[in-house]
């Protein structure tokens, strides 16, 4: 039982649940609502396979990250270490390869190879990026943050591209597909930007261990104040877009959506912005990271409104 609990902590079970919830809400509140009268046969089974493929690849990524981060984690979070303390490194690397392989196989089973081969290649690339992120990108300026943010957005984009033809994805006269495209990139864009914000905050939180092992993260290279400015700019951009979006949907009388978004998404972002300036200690940045994660959650939950309004 102790090993099972350790394994679930190693693969970040709450994060995997959040990822699955994102894809499930996207499927049932957006895709199914838009295409309710024309959902192709077998769509649900393909979707389920893709969800598990995403979860396995993400779990493998968390494992390989811990595998290569043992020295840094001994400084930043010694009480939370799993690999080499509760689970042997050999078992960790074995689980990484098994889960990565399972994720790629499930992707291939979920999609017709002739039409969707590029998505199988994309998920193979995700596995490779997670490995390179853990060994190189994570310790470099901005690159690691961008990679993780792109992979976060990909959890939504992979579902979108599995359902539409690549040639028609970015330009079509079909009203439903245009609506599907816009909502996909709205949420993928939100996921990308909020991840950029959180990764930069986590870099400030992890400075003690990162600096000891010569990582070139943003706060180490540019300084904490410059990193705060970077985070603040993205926060302002995201809040501005969300405010404009609320004004836009008011013309359709989406009162409940606006009443939810302002206190549950926009206000917490403003709180992060205000707290950011005075944050100095590791605990301060940890608190900001936690609030940012909460905003990711409340943002994804807003998909529920499209089930009622579309």
Model-derived regions, located:
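Alpha-helical transmembrane segments of integral membrane proteins
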Residues: 5, 14, 18, 22, ...
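Short helix-capping/hinge motifs at transmembrane helix termini and TM-loop junctions
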Residues: 30, 34, 110-115, 137-138, ...
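Hydrophobic alpha-helical transmembrane segments
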Residues: 38-49, 65-72, 89-98, 125-137, ...
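Multi-pass membrane catalytic core of lipid/isoprenoid biosynthesis enzymes
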Residues: 51-52, 70-123, 214-251
